[in-house]
Regions:
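Conserved short loop/turn motifs at secondary-structure junctions
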Residues: 11, 104-105, 180-184, 288-297, ...
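C-terminal or mid-to-C-terminal helical accessory/interaction module adjacent to the motor/catalytic core
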Residues: 94-95, 134-218, 288-292
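C-terminal helical "lid" subdomain and adjoining coupling/linker elements of P-loop NTPases
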Residues: 178-182, 197-264, 311
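Flexible beta-alpha connector loops of hexameric P-loop NTPases
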Residues: 75-79, 311, 498, 516-517
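Intrinsically disordered, low-complexity regulatory segments
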Residues: 1-161, 170, 175, 250, ...
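Basic, low-complexity terminal or inter-domain segments flanking catalytic cores
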Residues: 2-5, 10-14, 24-25, 32, ...
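C-terminal accessory/connector segments of nucleic-acid motor ATPases
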Residues: 206-236, 273, 280-316, 322, ...
Length: 949
């Protein structure tokens, strides 16, 4: 029976989904007797601050939003921005005969459905409607087969929410007191930050080793063709039976691991190459093995994020934003899933498409199934796949831009998962000879031929174009046999340096968190967004670099809240929460154990403290006694030569000596300087310019010395007042001071520039109404001021050039929220995959930003107008949207800004490659230069800072 005919007998039904976009799509699949409305996400939650808590609650309950003394009873409040929507839903419910709660079928969706039921208090029958794809068949099947609310899922999600609230609201204030105001800690975000910091520590401790090897190009003497090349390239493998050292043979301190491994330096490598100039080589062995490679499983949430990052350059958050749109508009199945399972319908659709597009030869006899790799995976969900019982090819969807790219990626992966293995042969050829000095050498070459491409015809992991990549995956070697003579056309000497462990990218951090079973895969995108927004991590290209601030935070947490950032403990907590979801453990005893450290509850994770001794201390005890935490100690890190890095309330700095001694030196350092780039040499260079002062000359009008300084709020110029000038009281004299223009730098600003800057504000003239118009430079950029009416200027140079007539023309225009007329975009990035609107880069009062006309996102450190890509622009917008709705924030604490000249970090030896026949060039070293920029540590309100994950 169709929903339409059913409704005719059953009256009017209200269906509540989470998003307006989903409501619009579903409405078209149901009959006129159905009203489909959106809750627009969560309608109720724990209070964001004490002001939202009902007056009857006091003390700790009011602060936490949870009554820890009465079985951790949560205090829920309807979100202020959802009250109008709740009223609308209540009004619709009054006119309905049934209520269908159609939120997502996961823990969070189940909780939203429960909150809707609790707030709406329906007097009509309530049914839980679930689906994993938004197609007509799926929606009608969901209506016909409703279920009841899963209270176990609701309880588990509530426990998770309470746990995260306690963690965030108890630990974050410790960071405010001991490190910096308005920081945040979270059950998963703090552990993720620790991972990034630990990787940077490994990079700091790393010592590079230089090693050399030889590569030979050997000719068979036959005419070659694509199927049988005439030569092959092989690398030196052994000398007199000893294996030649490669990068993997050195430890992190640059020491050789194995005693029997031969470490060639440059001199020995060149001597060996010279001794091989007239050597006669021959094939010593040819080993051939069958090659087989199976397709990858269909996507789950984390593997989609990783592949979208590698192949498309999307951040985790941007990937989820785009996938959300594809799901809501009926193109793919639900995108938050741990499962790699495909339904029978999906398998049939994929197999049909394999036959249609690639032929029956590419279809295996039996459907492929994939085992779950994620602990506690929700197998009721499917993998992420194209929706429907017949998959639309990417060309058939009509999608464009990033939505097309992501759909194509999902479609290819799904179809390839039901294709045959790729098969072929891998070959290893060993080539030997005797050097002029009698040493025996052996070179090795590896090749691979693919005889049947199988799934590689449709999908190659990590590559954009499968057709182009197929050739790259084949490395053909000449047809040679044991004993065949070979001629060395060239022997090259190659120099290498071992590299420190690579920093995490969003993709590799997601993979690491999942492998350690920390947090839920569905939350990883928001976790990464949080640590970026908090200023704990910033991006250099795709690499995630920890800030010095994060070093201080992690140091404090490791020393005083060890278990809270312990990887195994955090994973065990996640496992416990899953046990609660399955009904195998009770929430309240578990929360008591975590918070109060009381009793012994079987199967529950250990105490929240450091775990020393038999006492099982809880979180409450840990945050109560803060006297043992030395704020200066946790924020101090030795650099060398008695120089110490300190993280202060306004940013990081270095100093040498005691503050009150004559030899004391101090210098600010840029917050986006990668910690592994702060060497002793760089620190000495920064300290060599105490306070960053540059003497520019003497003001002829006053006789005062004019200097340029690098201050807390950025570079500026000021005058040095004569000794004896009163600095306090009613006769106090303040020195003239002015910030540098964006186009100026400390090391290039002149005395003339400084005097012009300090002459501001400039009187432009008097308007017809008798009011004076002045040109001024403020915190948000250049502007005109007439009385209380301010108007922005387009450039700082206008401060000195704008005429009265031009100023009057600006004031004659209607005021646009205090801004000047719109300026042309600096760059166009294309259509946003989420809003569908054109994205451009504009210059605003806070600097360059990307916008689609609805959402604005400031470019971050490492981004520039010249280098920003469309994908990066879309990612910034997606991250900004994810933080909506915007909450009123407290005033930001000041952060220090340093704009020094480029500095040189530790020099690293560049790998060199020269032929034996050529004269050796002098060794060169590649010097790192670090562009010093400002990164403002991002802060949120107290309530936001104490966030969950």
């Amino acid at each position: 029976m169709s929903p339409t005919s059913e409704t005719a007998q059953g009256g009017r039904r209200l269906v509540i989904v989470e998003s307006p976009a989903k409501a619009k799509t579903i409405k078209g699949y149901l009959g006129p007797g159905y009203v489909v409305e959106a809750s627009v996400g969560h309608i109720r939650d724990l209070p964001n601050g004490a002001a939202e808590v009902p007056e009857k609650y006091t003390g700790e309950v009011r602060r936490l939003g949870v009554d820890v003394e009465h079985d951790f009873e949560p205090i829920y409040v309807v979100n202020a921005d959802k009250k109008a929507q709740v009223k609308k839903l209540k009004d619709l419910l009054k006119e309905s005969d049934e209520l269908y709660l159609a939120t997502d079928e996961d823990r969070e969706g189940e909780a939203i459905a429960w909150h809707l039921q609790e707030v709406l208090k329906p007097k009509v029958p309530v049914k839980r409607m679930v689906f994993h794809e938004i197609t007509k068949a799926a929606i009608q099947a969901a209506v016909a087969n409703p279920r009841q609310l899963n209270q176990k899922l609701v309880d588990a999600q509530e426990t998770r929410r309470i746990l995260d609230r306690l963690y965030g609201y108890e630990v974050s204030p410790v960071l405010w007191k001991k490190v910096m105001p308005r920081l945040s800690a979270g059950r998963v975000q703090s552990v993720a930050t620790r991972l990034v910091v630990e990787r940077e520590r490994e990079r700091i401790a790393f010592r590079s080793a230089e090693y050399w090897d030889l590569t030979g190009t050997f000719a068979t003497g036959r005419a070659g063709d694509p199927s049988d090349p005439s030569s092959l390239v092989a690398r030196l493998q052994t000398v007199d039976g000893r294996r030649v050292a490669q990068g993997r043979d050195f430890d992190s301190l640059g020491q050789l691991k194995g005693a029997n491994t031969l470490h060639l330096d440059e001199a020995n490598a060149r001597a060996l190459a010279a001794a091989l100039e007239n050597t006669r080589f021959s094939v010593r062995s040819v080993e051939s093995k069958p090659y087989r490679r199976s397709p990858y499983a269909p996507f789950r949430t984390t593997t989609l994020q990783q592949e979208a990052s590698r192949k498309l350059g999307f951040g985790a958050k941007a990937t989820m934003q785009i996938a959300q749109k594809l799901y809501e508009n009926g193109y793919i199945t639900y995108m938050r899933t741990d499962s790699t399972t495909l339904s029978d319908t999906a398998i049939s659709a994929a197999r049909a498409q394999v036959t249609q597009l690639y032929g029956a030869d590419y279809l295996p006899p039996q459907p492929r199934t994939y085992a779950a790799k994620v602990k506690n995976a929700q197998e009721a969900h499917e993998a992420i796949r194209p929706s429907g019982d017949r998959f639309r090819t990417p060309a058939e969807t009509g999608l464009t831009g990033d939505q097309f790219k992501l759909y194509e990626l999902i479609w290819k992966r799904t179809v390839a998962s039901q294709m045959k293995d790729a098969t072929g042969n891998s070959v290893t050829v060993k080539i030997g000879g005797t050097a002029a000095d009698g040493r025996d050498v052996e070179f090795s070459a590896s090749g691979k031929t693919i005889t049947f491409h199988g799934f590689l015809k449709a999908y190659v992991e990590g590559a954009d174009d499968p057709n182009a990549e197929l050739d790259d995956r084949e490395r053909r070697l000449p047809q040679v046999a044991e004993g065949d003579p070979l001629t060395a056309d060239e022997i090259t000497v190659d120099g290498h340096s071992t590299k420190p462990p690579a920093r995490y990218t969003e993709a590799s951090l997601v993979k690491e968190l999942e492998e350690r079973e920390i947090g839920r895969p569905s939350t990883y995108a928001s976790i990464i967004g949080t640590i970026l927004d908090r200023g704990y991590v910033f991006k250099k290209g795709t690499a995630l670099v920890p800030s010095f601030l994060s070093f201080a935070v992690v140091n404090l947490l490791e020393k005083h809240f060890g278990r809270l950032v312990d990887y195994d403990f955090t994973a065990k907590m996640e496992d416990d929460l899953d046990r609660i979801a399955r009904g195998e453990a009770q929430a309240v005893p578990w929360l008591k154990r975590f918070y109060f450290g009381e009793g012994t509850v079987e199967g529950v994770a250990a105490d929240a403290g450091n775990g020393d001794g038999d006492h099982l201390g809880g979180l409450k005890e840990l945050v109560t006694d803060l006297g043992a935490i030395d704020a200066r100690e946790v924020s101090s890190f030795p650099v060398g030569n008695d120089i110490v890095l300190r993280v202060g309330r306004y940013g990081p700095y270095i100093e040498r000596g005691d503050k009150d001694t004559d030899g004391h030196q101090r210098a600010d350092i840029p917050e986006d300087l990668a910690p592994d780039e702060l060497t002793v040499e760089l620190a000495e260079e920064l300290l060599a310019k105490p306070s960053g002062d540059f003497e520019l000359g003497v003001d002829p009008a006053t006789g005062h010395t004019i200097v340029a300084k690098d201050g807390r709020y950025g570079p500026y110029v000021t005058e040095i007042l004569p000794e004896g000038t009163p600095k306090t009281g009613k006769n106090a004299v303040k020195p003239r001071t002015a910030s540098l223009f964006k186009s100026m730098a400390l090391d290039t600003v002149t005395l003339e520039d400084a005097l012009k800057l300090m002459s501001l504000p400039r009187v432009v003239g008097t308007d017809a109404d008798g009011q004076e118009i002045t040109a001024q430079n403020g915190r948000y950029g250049p502007y005109l001021k007439k009385g209380t009416d301010s108007r922005s200027l387009q450039s700082e140079e206008q401060l000195f050039t704008i005429t009265l007539e031009e100023a009057q023309a600006i004031y004659a225009q209607p005021k646009q929220r205090g801004r000047a007329a719109a300026k042309p975009p600096l760059k166009e990035l294309g259509e946003d995959p989420v809003s569908g609107k054109p994205v451009v880069v504009k210059d605003g009062r806070f600097g360059p930003y990307v916008t689609d006309g609805e959402t604005n996102a400031t470019l971050r450190s490492g981004d520039s107008v010249e280098t920003i890509t469309p994908e990066r622009g879309f990612e910034l917008l997606a991250e900004k949207r994810a933080k909506a709705p915007a909450k009123k924030t407290a005033k930001k604490a000041a952060t220090k800004k340093t704009t020094a000249a480029k500095t040189t970090a530790a020099k690293k030896t560049a790998a060199k490659k020269t032929t034996a026949a050529k004269k050796t060039a002098a060794k060169k070293t590649a010097a790192k230069t670090t562009a010093v920029k400002k990164t403002a540590v991002k802060k949120a309100t107290a309530s936001k800072a104490a966030s969950e994950d």
